[in-house]
Amino acid sequence: MRRIALVASLLVGPGLVVTAAPAQAYTPSAYTTAAFEARVIARINWVRHRYGRASLAANWCPDKYAESWGSYLARTGRFYHRNMTVILRGCSARRAGENLARGYTTADRTVAAWMASPGHRANVLDRSLTRIGVAAVYTRGQWTVVANFTRP
């Protein structure tokens, strides 16, 4: 077994480590994905209430863009913000924001990380934003989360 690992590391290249996936890797069901997304929204609204802000309403339009962008980021392994013009036009919104996260194991940890980042925190607490859509996509053993915020 040691020889196989050595050969694999030599084939991949120096400095890279290759590990085998566990025999039964965790794959969340559609229910756990929906539950993760719902928990992100609930946690964001809890934080907003704590800071005297109104709740955000879950909305199909920012959700549609969160789902498509989250799937793209998870599938490609890339990680960057999309151009907000797409959401502004597609949702007929006057304002839009986006938060991204990858690698956090729970919705609560995801939102806590956003609250520790000034730009992401600003989106969560922005009084002018009224709608939210969230995507949570589990691939390659980790969650990729996209939250899109809009104001019509």
Label for each model-derived stretch:
Residues 1-25:
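Secretory targeting and sorting signals
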